[in-house]
Amino acid sequence: MSVRADQRSESSLLSEYYRKYGASGYVLTIDFSKYFDNIEHESLFQMLSEQIKDKTLLALTKYYVQEFGPVGLGLGSQVSQILAVFFPNKIDHFIKEKLRMRFYGRYMDDSYILCNSKEELQNALKEISKLCEKYKIRLNPKKTRITPIKHGVDFLHCRYKFGRTGKIIKSGGRESVKRERRKLKKFRKKLDEGELDRKQIAELYSSWRGFMQYFDSKTLLKKTDKLYNKLFIEE
């Protein structure tokens, strides 16, 4: 699930931006630090109580979350992923409705805003930082930054750039494969230590494979599938 002004793809959003402003302007890239580990339960429960009116469902959800301890959500579970997408929902509305930023996208802990004014993005970052502090969401200072849009937009391990005619050029599949191969080896260790089970790992890997379908990456996927099978299937 990705959050945008009207749920379009990044490529179409950048194309619209280019038609309006060309390749000038800036991108504010926002990254939450150790997002799953730091989700604050009290804030999450307050948001859930505003949305879930069924008391039984709300109680079950709270019980599930509390199983992870006083703070954070576990990796692998689909419920955790849904809650992780939901948690910054108020920030999404603030950016789109209060700051009136049209060119905005988010998935989990990665988000970006495109704007032709650097000053507007600087002011937006100040306001977003205050809201994150309120909900105890930590911004990653190294990855949260404002850069010229002509250098590209980094989102979900991809880089989107404008071609000479405004065509959107998408790259980054090879780097994503390298990261995923490292993750699979860590997942194997977590499996051995009982922190993850095979079903959770399969769901995480399936989600990543779905994302990789956007790339011309059949050969890379075959190699990664081979590693996955070696670590989790062929035993």
What residue ranges belong to the model's regions?
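Right-hand nucleic-acid polymerase module
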Residues: 67-68, 122-123, 139-235
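Conserved polymerase palm-domain catalytic core
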Residues: 5-108, 112-129, 137-141, 147, ...
